[in-house]
Swiss-Prot record:
It comes from Shigella boydii serotype 4 (strain Sb227). Activates the small RNA gene sgrS under glucose-phosphate stress conditions as well as yfdZ. Represses its own transcription under both stress and non-stress conditions. Might act as a sensor of the intracellular accumulation of phosphoglucose by binding these molecules in its C-terminal solute-binding domain. HAMAP family: HTH_type_SgrR (MF_01449). This is HTH-type transcriptional regulator SgrR. Pfam families: SBP_bac_5, SgrR_N. NCBIfam families: PRK13626.1. Residues 1-116 form the HTH marR-type domain.
Length: 551
């Protein structure tokens, strides 16, 4: 019998007997474990050989045998749990232990650095699965970060300073306002072994031509080996940065024929996906990466949904048994905000917008929040922390306003917390707030109508590029805010847009109402080096490393 199955049987027997040694019979024990008398005898003999118990059998009708436990079920369960943790089999761990609080405690105790068979392993605890990692699809903040570890693009943006750097393309030049040329590295390999070809690059960029920010790409050709020419329908000063974004990352041209590509993608980046389930994401350093090989050999993201009910204030890399330390913290470049839907009567009503902006002001939300959230929330008066565009002006409740509908995407605990506070405040004004949770894909597409949407945005460096790029690429915003997005995109591409003024107009019209800036925190080990928190609340895995202990 496999060891794991035998351990489960022993734990069950120990629990049924309440851990007490006793006089009993094979028939009674077989009934407890719902098995045959013969199988029960085999189990007892095997468990005795393992040193877990002794079985002193008595022969004869009416005689009772002696069962003595030498090992406790709890100790064996702990040993089994430790084995499962080392093997990263979190789903089986949850089934074995059962108690969610105990599972969480065990996971936390194993976070951070592990050194196994000469490999450095980093373990991270997260609250939800990361199942969709497909560039060009609707990706949330953490999926965006993970995709950058798996894929490469023609260019890349330095997360620390926002500067443009070479990636698959080692140089590029603007030949004319409508013509750019990129020079690509040879010898780049995908994780599944095949060498990258120009057809992969061309196919990857053509597949995103339907996205708003890439719709001005007219043609992509390769005039000579490892040279790529991109022709545009309108000038774009941001094109090199645009080609470093996640939608423009390079996929193998046969990606649609590869099994479960969205959850098990294949790229050319520093890490390759080894496992991606509802309980765990495991990525491993790619030895044939064309850049510097990652210093951390393996990153395990353990998924424990139960921690979603806690304030989402930090990325936990190290458990409390060690020297837990706040490594970095920063106020996010972005905010939670309300989006009014101009497609509904109440969402388009300026009086409703003004009054909701007044009663659901950032200070009101923070005031009514629990202390654990107050420590992480900062009132927002603009889309960025440095902006003060919003003004809270006293406004009268519109006559006849009795209800409003608020919609947000699911699997985000703070959405529920903020919505609950809003519901409480509006109820005090005799307004019922109907709350709807939908999938992230539904939220992103924005085909459903709602009076108000509760959203969040995290902008990456450089901000003068990413702020408009982020807002423009979310279809929901284009559905809700009736402005000429294409004309604004053309001005942005030409460098003619005053971004601060453009955002101020959105806030002044109450199309978007900033609510809260969130403190992002990473907790980890003192021995970790090269860790620089990015604006998504994560860090570049390939640049981090563990310092060895002092000799």
């Amino acid at each position: 019998m496999p060891s794991a199955r035998l351990q489960q049987q022993f734990i069950r027997l120990w629990q049924c007997c309440e851990g007490k040694s006793q006089d009993t019979t094979l028939n009674e024990l077989a009934a407890l474990l719902s098995c045959s008398r013969r199988h029960m005898r085999t189990l007892l003999n095997t468990m005795q050989d393992r040193g877990w118990l002794t079985w002193e059998a008595e022969v004869g009708r009416g005689k009772r045998s002696r069962l003595t436990f030498l090992y406790t079920g709890l100790a064996l369960q702990q040993q089994r749990a430790e084995d499962l943790l080392e093997q990263d089999r979190i789903d089986q761990l949850v089934q074995l232990v059962g108690d969610k609080a105990t599972v969480r405690q065990m996971l936390v105790s194993h976070l951070g650095r592990s050194f196994r068979q000469g490999r450095h392993i980093l373990r991270v605890l997260y609250y939800r699965p990361l199942r969709n990692l497909l560039p060009g699809s609707a990706l949330r903040r953490s999926e965006t970060h993970i995709a950058r570890q798996i894929f490469s693009s023609l260019t890349r943006i330095n997360e620390e300073n926002g500067e443009l750097e070479a990636d698959i393309a080692h140089h590029w030049q603007q030949i004319s306002p409508l013509h750019w040329r990129f020079f690509l590295r040879p010898g780049v390999h995908f994780h599944h072994g095949r060498e990258l070809e120009m057809d992969d690059v061309i196919a990857s960029l053509k597949r995103i031509n339907t996205l708003p920010l890439y719709s001005h790409i007219a043609d992509i050709v390769s005039p000579t080996p490892w040279t790529l020419d991109i022709h545009l329908t309108q000038p774009d000063r941001w094109l090199p940065l645009l080609l470093g974004q996640v939608p423009a990352m390079i996929l193998p041209r046969e990606w649609e024929t590869l099994s479960n590509f969205a959850s098990h993608p294949i790229g050319t980046g520093p890490y390759a996906v080894i496992r991606n389930t509802t309980n765990q994401l495991k990525i491993q350093a790619f030895d044939d990466f064309f850049g510097y090989r990652a210093l951390i050999d393996e990153v395990n993201v353990w998924v424990l949904p139960e921690i979603a009910d806690e304030p989402a204030g930090g990325l936990m890399l190290k458990g409390p048994q060690g020297e837990e330390k706040e490594i970095e913290s920063r106020l996010e470049e972005g905010c939670y905000y309300l989006l009014f839907d101009s497609r509904t009567h109440r969402g388009a009503n300026q009086q409703v917008r003004d009054w909701v902006n007044y009663v659901l002001s950032p200070t009101n939300l923070v005031y009514f929040a629990e202390e654990q959230y107050q420590q992480l929330w900062f009132p927002a008066y603009g889309l960025l922390p440095r902006w003060h565009h919003a003004r809270t002006i006293k406004s009268e409740k519109p006559a006849g306003l009795e209800s409003l509908t608020l919609t947000f995407y699911q699997d985000h605990s703070e959405h529920r917390v903020i919505a609950g506070i809003m519901q409480q405040i509006l109820a005090s004004h005799q307004v019922t707030l109907e709350i709807k949770e939908i999938s992230y894909d539904q939220w992103h597409e924005g085909e459903i109508e709602s009076d108000i949407w509760l959203n969040s945005a995290n902008f990456t460096l450089p901000l003068d590029f990413s702020l408009f790029a982020h807002l423009c690429e979310v279809p929901l915003l284009q559905h809700c805010i009736p402005i000429d997005w294409q004309a604004d995109a053309a001005r942005w591409r030409n460098g003619e847009m005053n971004l601060a003024n453009w955002c101020q107009q959105l806030v002044a019209s109450k199309a978007m109402v900033p609510l809260i800036h969130h403190w992002l925190i990473i907790q980890g080990q003192r021995s970790m080096r090269g860790l620089r928190m990015n604006t998504l609340g994560w860090f570049d895995f390939k640049s981090a490393w563990f310092a060895p202990p002092d000799p």
